[in-house]
């Protein structure tokens, strides 16, 4: 069974960055600003992204499941679907759309998390189990997830908090090596990235990439900077 995203991260020769195609942020509003999302996708590919992330949630992030399908057809990079997944039907739909990985939020799924992880893996999906505290990490470590993501921001506040990589610095050392460790959110530039990648295997970056006038140049700098 091919777990494309976790394998790509483990094999990465440069900094492993999952680049998020983020069209809207509850904090900053419209991030696309009239640009063609597929041109941004190509920029991410050229700059050396290890994978692509996309939020399908329509309510808070103005995403769409149909766009996820198109995205998976348009790129050979592994695609991570982010959403507030709460049903196994949504896991199945993720696999059917052609995504490589699915986000599973510990706070949302609680004791059902191990079952959801196993179900997703049976469907060939990498699982990125998201945590925001030591208590949530304890639950995540009871699963056979391929990846654990530390969300530096609080999803309960819908990214309206600032967030920084100090949570990654605190939690990542507690995660065994069998899991791929991903630092998510709150990474604004190279200094944040260096701090995150001292402890994590990869970083997921969205808002900072979408806000820059030249996503390709900025991402290339992040991929190539010495950490």
Curated annotation (Swiss-Prot):
Reaction catalysed by this enzyme: 1-(2-carboxyphenylamino)-1-deoxy-D-ribulose 5-phosphate + H(+) = (1S,2R)-1-C-(indol-3-yl)glycerol 3-phosphate + CO2 + H2O
GO molecular function, one term: indole-3-glycerol-phosphate synthase activity
Main EC class the enzyme belongs to: lyase
UniProt EC number: 4.1.1.48
This protein's record includes keyword Transferase: no
Keyword terms of this UniProt record: Amino-acid biosynthesis, Aromatic amino acid biosynthesis, Decarboxylase, Lyase, Tryptophan biosynthesis
The keyword Lyase is assigned to this record: yes
UniProt-listed Gene3D superfamilies: Aldolase class I
Record pathway: Amino-acid biosynthesis; L-tryptophan biosynthesis; L-tryptophan from chorismate: step 4/5
InterPro entries named among the record's database cross-references: Aldolase_TIM, Indole-3-glycerol_P_synth, Indole-3-glycerol_P_synth_dom, Indole-3-GlycerolPSynthase_CS, RibuloseP-bd_barrel
GO BP term, pick one: L-tryptophan biosynthetic process
UniProt family annotation: Belongs to the TrpC family.
Name of this chain's protein: Indole-3-glycerol phosphate synthase
Taxonomic source organism: Thermococcus kodakarensis (strain ATCC BAA-918 / JCM 12380 / KOD1)
Gene name of this polypeptide: trpC
């Amino acid at each position: 069974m091919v777990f494309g995203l976790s394998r790509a991260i483990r094999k990465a020769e440069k900094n492993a960055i999952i680049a998020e195609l983020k069209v809207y942020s509850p904090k900053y509003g419209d991030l696309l600003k009239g640009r063609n999302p597929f041109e941004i996708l190509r920029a991410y590919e050229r700059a050396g992204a290890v994978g692509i992330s996309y939020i399908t949630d329509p309510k808070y992030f103005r995403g769409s499941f149909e766009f996820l399908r198109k995205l998976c057809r348009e790129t050979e990079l592994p695609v991570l679907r982010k959403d507030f997944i709460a049903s196994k039907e949504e896991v199945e739909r993720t696999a059917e759309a052609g995504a490589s990985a699915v986000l599973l939020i510990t706070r949302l799924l609680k004791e059902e998390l191990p079952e959801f992880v196993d179900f997703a893996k049976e469907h060939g999906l990498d699982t990125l189990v998201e945590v925001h505290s030591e208590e949530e990490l304890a639950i995540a470590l009871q699963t056979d997830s391929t990846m654990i993501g530390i969300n530096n921001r609080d999803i309960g506040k819908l990214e309206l908090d600032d967030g920084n990589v100090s949570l990654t610095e605190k939690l990542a050392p507690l995660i065994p090596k069998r899991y791929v460790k991903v630092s998510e959110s709150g990474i604004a530039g190279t200094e944040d990235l260096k701090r995150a990648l001292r402890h994590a295997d990869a970083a997921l970056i969205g808002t900072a990439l979408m806000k820059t006038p030249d996503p390709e140049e900025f991402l290339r700098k992040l991929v190539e900077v010495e950490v």
